[in-house]
Amino acid sequence: MNRTKTRRRGFGISWGIGLGLFVALIGCMAFDILQREGGFGKSDDVLVMGTNAGFKPFEYKQGNEIVGFDVDLAKEIARSMNKELRIEDMSFDGLLPALESGQIDMAVAGMSVTPERAKNALFSEPYYSASQRIIVKKGSPIRNRYQLTGKKIGVQLGTTGDTLAGKIAGAKVSQFPTAPSVLTELNAGGVEAVILDDAPAAQYTAGFPDLEILPGELSSEHYAIAIKNNNHDLLEKINRVLAEMKKDGRYDNLIRKHFGAAALESMKKKELES
């Protein structure tokens, strides 16, 4: 055996393996950077919407498809930009991190604008006015917000209802991934009350005959579309589309489609009074 040739061959193999590992390492680093910057796996022809599809009538599953007011709104935005809309369904509390990492372009998920959220994202002009409501089982001794002290309260994780419940003295707050899951827990007696946005509360409690929504609002809020902090170009485009939709009637058509004619009339009346 020629030992010199063997050594050279061994050196060549080792050098080749080392080079391969180096290239793989560089590739992994580039992949990570591109993902964080939102530049990997995303085409210029695609607009990625992040949402939490358990919030009817804004976003919910119909068979294998995610539909709702927010979805139709996002489709109009994508169409105006000559882009295809892609929807990423995820937990509500994961939306802003996904926005920051570049996994999604915008979060359209019935998201209320709050000072805390505004620290981590840009927000479009408001597209819907909402409020938080209390839901209880019929016959419950809880009749108003003041009687929530020390009670077991169910909320959807990461929502403004979650924040409100956390401020109630002595409250034992249980967090759930979706609106239907927290109402199911209330119906089963696992919690004594639920704090939830008004429109989903009305939609989902219709399927629970033993539940009722108490009169009175816990808060007044505005939904808006969240965009990554430095993406002012996309923010400007979204605001322009929202303004055009409100002007040409497309926005009213979506309200009528998802909430009914009576809701549209009520909304118009409130606008005139304000």
Task: Show where each model-derived region lies.
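A ligand-binding cleft/hinge motif common to bilobed small-molecule-binding domains
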Residues: 97, 111-119, 164, 187-188, ...
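Acidic, polar ligand-binding/catalytic clefts
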Residues: 75, 79, 84-147, 212-217
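Ligand-binding cleft/hinge of the Venus flytrap
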Residues: 59-62, 74-83, 145-147, 158-178, ...
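Extracytoplasmic small-molecule ligand-binding "clamshell" domains
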Residues: 14, 39-110
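Ligand-binding clefts/hinges and TM-proximal coupling segments of bilobed small-molecule sensing domains
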Residues: 17, 28-34, 160-177, 212-217, ...
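Short helix-initiation/N-cap motifs at beta->coil->alpha
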Residues: 86-97, 140, 157-160, 174-188, ...
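Periplasmic-binding protein-like
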Residues: 53, 128-136, 198, 202-243, ...
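Extended ligand-binding regions for polar small-molecule ligands
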Residues: 32-33, 71-80, 146-147, 152, ...
